[in-house]
Curated annotation (Swiss-Prot):
One of its GO terms (biological process) is cyanide catabolic process. Keywords: Hydrolase, Lyase. It comes from Emericella nidulans (strain FGSC A4 / ATCC 38163 / CBS 112.46 / NRRL 194 / M139). The keyword Lyase applies. This is Cyanide hydratase. The gene is cht. Induction: By cyanide.
Length: 364
């Protein structure tokens, strides 16, 4: 299917989530979807773990300190088959907009770092999970499986893909997306401290600037613009922000309160050739970053270097992707033979259709 729309407006969220509060998180999600819809956007991109906020506290606490926060975080994470998710899908439908949404997904007793791409009809086009939680994130989240790996979907606005955080740095994930002909990418980022917090021997890769743009007087080798250049995609980089109240909610008793500004101002949008297309947001900016996308502007970049096509040698180098779900327990398919298989999307209820639109679909 060729894109129906080659030129359209898109938005990346640069805002504070509803920390530890599922209902507030959903309200803010619908608010920004409505805002993007009012501004005639066809795509809105949310940060990693937007619902119920990225648990940055796990980088700063010991085991005992983590327990109350972990319990509250689990209680306010999102079931995919839930009234809350249906309200978000209805908002996408009411605004006729594609939504890339990052959330902490509850699946039985486990949590996953999940993204879904919602269509303007409110259907789930893609459901993926971060393939490997980063470092201390494994305190909270499990890993994705084979059928939650693919990140790119053909849509009416082009081949749209999304990845979480350091997946955008993973050369194998980039190669996979490039092989699928990705045109528009959502590099979803969490809450991240700035370089002023860096202490030896912590690597520079673990601060925000290393992931949002290049340093002055240094090579443009950093994560998000590099993704745009290497894949030849429009790359939207939504980021979370935090206020003083958010700092209090994420800080255990007895710990010093940080300056929220060290975390803010990192939202970006890059052209297929790596140019930054939007002014850097102010530290106190809460809102949407907008970009006008023209899919025809991708052609010349990819004509020089299409690593999913003419500029690759699959006879020499190939990537093996196993897209099958791996279940702990499998059962026999007595009708068709072999093993009975249920996709993760089916199992968590994301293939269920929405009910007919209601008059209150757009209410925040």
């Amino acid at each position: 299917m060729s894109p129906v729309l080659k030129k359209y407006k898109a938005a990346a969220v640069n805002a504070e989530p509803g920390w530890f509060d599922l209902e507030e998180s959903v309200r803010r999600t619908i608010h920004w979807i409505n805002e993007a819809g009012r501004n005639r956007c066809k795509l809105i991109a949310f940060p990693e773990l937007w619902i119920p906020g990225y648990p940055y506290w796990m980088w700063k606490v010991n085991y005992q300190e983590s327990l109350p926060l972990l319990k509250k975080y689990r209680e306010n994470s999102l079931l995919s088959d839930s009234e809350e998710m249906r309200r978000i899908r209805e908002a996408a439908r009411a605004n006729k907009i594609y939504v890339s949404l990052g959330y902490s997904e509850v699946d039985l007793a486990s949590l996953y770092t999940t993204q879904v791409l919602i269509s303007p009809a409110g259907n789930i086009l893609n459901h993926r999970r971060k393939i490997r939680a980063t470092h201390v994130e494994r305190l909270v989240f499990g890993d994705g499986t084979g059928d939650t790996t693919e990140s790119v979907v053909q849509t009416e606005i082009g081949r749209v893909g999304h990845l979480n955080c350091w997946e955008n740095m993973n050369p194998f994930m980039k190669s996979y997306a490039a092989s699928l002909g990705e045109q528009v990418h959502v590099a979803a980022w969490p809450l991240y401290p700035g370089k002023e917090t860096l202490k030896y021997p912590d690597p520079y890769t673990n601060v925000a600037e290393a992931n949002c743009d290049a340093l002055a007087n240094e090579l443009p080798q950093l994560v998000t613009p590099a993704y745009a250049i290497e894949t030849g995609t429009y790359t939207l980089a939504p980021w979370q922000t935090i206020t003083e109240e958010g700092i209090k909610l994420n800080t255990p008793p007895g710990k010093p309160l940080e300056d929220p500004n060290i975390y803010n101002g990192h939202g970006r949008i890059f052209a297929p050739d790596g140019r930054n297309l939007v002014p850097h947001p102010a530290k106190d900016f809460q809102g949407l970053l907008y970009v006008d996308i023209d899919l025809d502007e991708i052609h010349l970049t990819k004509s020089l270097a299409d690593f999913g096509g003419h500029y690759m040698r699959p006879d020499l180098i190939r990537l093996l992707v196993d897209g099958n779900r791996k279940d702990l327990v499998v059962s026999e398919d007595r009708i068709n033979g072999g093993i009975k298989y249920t996709s993760t999307m089916d199992r968590v209820g994301l293939t269920k259709p929405l009910e007919a639109p209601k008059p209150t679909d757009q209410k925040e």
